[in-house]
């Protein structure tokens, strides 16, 4: 089929949104589709160096706005302006596509303009329907006011979001990555809603069988140090674990909360047991996943998690909060899920108890094997095959 892909960020050699855009595009082309991709001009050089001349990349740009110069609400406004530009650019090409697939950004709130084209739109996978638990406002600090605004925009004010309503109603299929987002799009009258994990892996990421690592257990945390990611909660939970057994915590990621995390480590007397790596290139992260004993994910608001899937792909058992997208994934013994406590003061201890279970139980290898088995179902070739079946359905109707 002739498929138009919208991927705001797209380049090889990355994880997250940037890698998703590239891997969606290449996987669909490898499946046999004739793929045209719209992405931001910021990625032109990296895309062209990727060596995929079989894919027709285009780079609509917003003049006068450097990519990455705007953050927060200004960044969202720039993205919406790019969306309008991308639609106008696609329409000006005068081509006939069989299907349009918007893969990034995958946001409930930001929509897509491409439903206006004369081809069925597959929208997503998207997230964004989840909101942060109010009892945990202290982890957000000064950002809690902004978080309350986002919660309102996701709740009662979402009905005022014309971009959301138009996209959801006009899309042939909406792919959602968690149940909260599913509920939101159904309220707006989406015609066809299906679950698909937002993230995927290249096939070569999947690990072979692993043995429990020897030596002092290593707990790995990966992500941007943002309030909603709750990196200080990770340190607090590790402090509780450290009271009961030897262990090390390795944290890969940077962001505005890094100084606060450093201070928390010092205040809890953990400097000898915690390694703060800062930002680590995606291609280097594989080594940390492969050498660690357990992955810790304690985000207080997330649609799903690329890092969790990456850890599973390397056979790394996990401890995580039973919340939002992580509550929806069915990974069996690969992860210990910890229910959110009404009393925030109890949560570090509960996370520590779950971590101790993963690290000391006799079934580490079985947990690792379950992680690999689940992650193997979410490679990009598998996602391209699933998307292709949807394309067949929406073009036949």
Q: What do these predicted regions represent?
A:
Residues 300:
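Aromatic "clamp/platform" in nucleotide-sugar-dependent glycosyltransferases that forms part
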Residues 56-59, 123, 153-208:
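Donor nucleotide-sugar binding/catalytic pocket of nucleotide-sugar-dependent glycosyltransferases
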Residues 262-280:
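Nucleotide-activated donor-binding/catalytic signature segment of Leloir-type glycosyltransferases, i.e.
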Residues 279-280, 287-292:
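Short alpha-helical donor nucleotide-sugar binding micro-motif in glycosyltransferases
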Residues 19, 217, 224-240, 256-262:
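A conserved mid-protein helix/loop that constitutes part of the nucleotide-sugar donor-binding site
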Residues 317-322, 327:
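Short hydrophobic beta-strand element within catalytic cores of glycosyltransferases
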Residues 1-55, 95, 119, 381:
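N-terminal subdomain of nucleotide-sugar transferases
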